[in-house]
């Protein structure tokens, strides 16, 4: 049976509307999700893999040093007065090297190489890196703190060794150029032949102290970041590629072939989260993302804070902090001693970096108030000192990230070393870093073209198809049944009767209903 032309048009229009419903609300989300699963996996064919291997633009690496303006008084036990100097801005280039794929368990192994280049134009006005800063002698205090913790009976010998290695220093401070302590290095004189300095330097060489480089003639060169600069990190990291299950992408499963650490207790030794450079897609506000920091030997679990936007893309902001190890059951296993945890907001890094330092938020943000009261000159501000990451939730792409950490040291108080007998024993700040990522315009546009433009086009198209398809179907149906509709409109419940003249020969007035009209009665006045 052939359909009338109007019904054919109506059927076609209705089909368009139905297709718009099915494709726009059912098929397209499935197709988009499937495509994202392929694109976000660390397979060799994806753009994500290329960017994961080598970030094609520099990250911002900013360092803020704390200058001690009252060093002589601090040596006598006074509260330090600090002046923040910075930022010293470095362009940080990151890449992964010695990459190997393992098809059988869907993993990939790699090592890291970071390169830092000082950028005076982006640093604070007037800073060249040649400024002299006064800070606690990191190496000297580190030696004393390590021996005090591990072999306290040898503190007297370490005191004698310090006099030889550091030429009988007048106090526990160093006056040093900013770039020297950060990257270029300061000389540690281990050429002395006296027993105490020689024995101490031999132990240093054997232990492989972090930040220490052996120079000719039994000299050492020490810096905070110099050993990281343009060198391959020895640790081999294994992560999931996410090809079999995209929700596993980037998950750290082993470091140096070991599936867990041995430096903490219980669950804190587990590798939880991604390597911090890639995250799974389809994030919601209720999801707790996780990333593992090999530099701090721990996982962080940022939580959702609020809706944000970046270059026209809607994002979700997540924030994090160091935490409170004594009160948070998940973090209690980071306490080296179960019965004695660091104060709130402080993390003992000694088990991780083999140096007696503490990590905190900059300016002791979200920390025990006592830490802030131990010094003058700090002003914690969550906007300037907090950890925050803005994610595009559908793809899981970090659009903007600010990872901020402060490094602190204890002013060891001990009677066994003259230089240390009058110190306060408080934990004080040395410097803090702000490592920032912000996707440039090129990669934002790439994300828009791959994800948002198709999504918006389909969003408009599906409504157009449903609206105009429904309208076209209605018009076709109405047009086809127009004659029938008109007949129904005319007939309805109304009856039409034919009027014929009566056969009565008496003429009647058609305007009169009822009996024939009679002459009205006359009234006498």
Curated annotation (Swiss-Prot):
Membrane protein topology class: Multi-pass membrane protein
Gene Ontology BP terms: sensory perception of smell
Principal subcellular localization: membrane
Glycosylation sites: 67, 229, 324, 440
GO molecular function term, any single one: scavenger receptor activity
Keywords: Cell membrane, Disulfide bond, Glycoprotein, Membrane, Olfaction, Receptor, Sensory transduction, Transmembrane, Transmembrane helix
InterPro entries: CD36_fam (IPR002159)
Xref: PANTHER family: SCAVENGER RECEPTOR CLASS B TYPE-1 SR-B1, SENSORY NEURON MEMBRANE PROTEIN 1
Protein name: Sensory neuron membrane protein 1
Organism of origin: Mamestra brassicae
Lineage of source species: Eukaryota, Metazoa, Ecdysozoa, Arthropoda, Hexapoda
């Amino acid at each position: 049976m052939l359909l009338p032309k109007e019904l054919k048009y109506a059927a076609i229009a209705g089909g368009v509307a139905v297709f718009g419903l099915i494709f726009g609300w059912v098929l397209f989300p499935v197709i988009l999700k499937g495509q994202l699963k392929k694109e976000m996996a660390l397979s060799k064919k994806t753009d994500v893999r290329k960017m994961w291997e080598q970030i094609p633009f520099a990250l911002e690496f900013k360092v803020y040093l704390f200058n001690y303006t009252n060093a002589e008084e601090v040596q006598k036990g006074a509260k330090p007065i600090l002046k923040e100097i910075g930022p010293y801005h470095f362009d940080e280039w990151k890449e992964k090297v010695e990459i190997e794929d393992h098809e059988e368990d869907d993993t990939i192994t790699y090592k890291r190489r970071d390169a830092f280049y000082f950028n005076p134009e982006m640093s604070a006005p007037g800073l060249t890196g040649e400024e002299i800063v006064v800070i606690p002698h990191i190496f000297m205090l580190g030696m004393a703190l390590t021996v005090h913790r591990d072999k306290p009976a040898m503190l007297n010998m370490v005191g004698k060794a310090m006099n030889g290695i550091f030429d009988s220093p007048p106090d526990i401070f160093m006056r040093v150029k900013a770039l020297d302590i950060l990257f270029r290095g300061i000389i540690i004189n281990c050429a002395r032949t006296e027993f105490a300095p020689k024995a101490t330097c031999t132990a240093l060489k054997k232990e492989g102290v972090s930040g220490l480089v052996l120079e000719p003639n039994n000299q050492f060169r020490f810096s905070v970041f110099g050993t990281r600069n343009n060198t391959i990190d020895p640790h081999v990291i294994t992560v999931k590629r996410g090809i079999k299950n995209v929700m596993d992408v980037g998950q750290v499963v082993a470091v140096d072939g070991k599936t867990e650490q041995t430096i903490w207790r219980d669950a804190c030794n587990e590798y939880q989260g991604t390597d911090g450079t890639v995250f799974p897609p389809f994030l919601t506000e209720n999801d707790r993302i996780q990333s593992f920091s090999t530099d701090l030997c721990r996982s962080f679990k940022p939580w959702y804070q609020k809706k944000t936007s970046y270059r026209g893309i809607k994002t979700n902001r997540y924030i994090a902090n160091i935490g409170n190890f004594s009160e948070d059951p998940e973090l209690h296993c980071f306490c080296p001693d179960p019965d004695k945890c660091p104060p709130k907001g402080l993390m003992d890094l000694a088990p991780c970096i083999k140096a007696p330092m503490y990590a905190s938020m900059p300016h002791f943000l979200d920390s025990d108030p006592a830490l802030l009261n131990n010094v003058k000159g700090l002003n914690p501000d969550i906007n300037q000192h907090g950890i925050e990451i803005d994610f595009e939730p559908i793809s899981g792409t970090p659009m903007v990230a600010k990872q901020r950490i402060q490094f602190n040291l204890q002013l060891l108080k001990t009677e066994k070393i003259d230089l240390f007998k009058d110190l306060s024993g408080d934990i004080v700040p040395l410097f803090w870093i702000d490592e920032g990522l912000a996707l440039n315009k090129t990669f934002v546009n790439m994300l828009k073209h791959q994800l948002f433009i198709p999504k918006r086009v389909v969003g408009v198209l599906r409504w157009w198809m449903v609206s105009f398809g429904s309208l076209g179907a209605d018009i076709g149906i109405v047009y086809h049944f127009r004659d029938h509709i008109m007949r129904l409109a005319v007939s309805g419940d109304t009856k039409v009767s034919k009027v014929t003249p009566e056969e009565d020969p008496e003429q009647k007035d058609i305007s009169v209903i009822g009996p024939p009209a009679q002459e009205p009665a006359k009234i006498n006045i």
